[in-house]
Each structure stands twice: as structure tokens, then as C-alpha cells.
Amino acid sequence: ERRLDEVRSALPAALDTAAENIVYKQRSRQRGTEQYTKRDSRGELLTVHEGRARLLVNLHDYIDTGLFLDHRPLRLRIGQEAAGKDFLNLFCYTGTATVHAALGGAGTDR
């Protein structure tokens, strides 16, 4: 807990932003559908610029934003390699990979 407080104190200066611009989330073990439970009702959306895509995320209302940072390189690669290809996203959670594919020129026209 002390380390978390130290990180929260240091982040605004390290990121050169105001403390109110930083959203903190603390994960704990979830069971069943608990991870999808609504935590807040702000409904505030933030636009994330990722490659050619503009993606809306909700940082407050749920534990997950739906935009996973570790998937970013793959989403960008999909956009780079999608031109002229059909794209079917069978494991879609948020559709962000599909957005990149569409922007990269993928389609389903035959």
C-alpha cells in the first residue's frame, strides 16, 4: 500500500500531467462475471489515437477498458498487412483489431 501511494505521488511529475488526468485501477482476483460488473456510471469516453485508428475507451465505468496495451503491436500489424484481404475476427471483444483491418484496406467483397 505504501508503494502504491509513492507511485501515485510520483506519477504526475513523471508524466508531466495533473493528478486528475491519471486514472488508477487496482485489480484483484475476479470470479465469474465480476470482471464485467459496472463500477461507475460516468459514461465519459476518451479518444485514443492508435496508428490510423481513433478508438473510444471508457476508463472509469468498468475494470477493463477493452483496449489492452499488450495487443497494440498486433493491432498495428493487422492494419499494415490487411490491404486486399478478407478479415474475420472470431475472438472479438471490442472490435479494435477489426477497426485496424478495415482502415488497412481489408474487406469482405469478393
Q: Can you name each region flagged by the protein language model?
A:
Residues 81-110:
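Conserved SAM/SAH cofactor-binding pocket of Class I
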Residues 1-5, 107-110:
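Proteins with a high burden of low-complexity, intrinsically disordered sequence enriched in S/T/G/P/A and R
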Residues 3-68, 76, 80:
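Non-catalytic substrate-recognition/targeting regions of SAM-dependent transferases
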Residues 67-70, 99-100:
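A short secondary-structure junction signal
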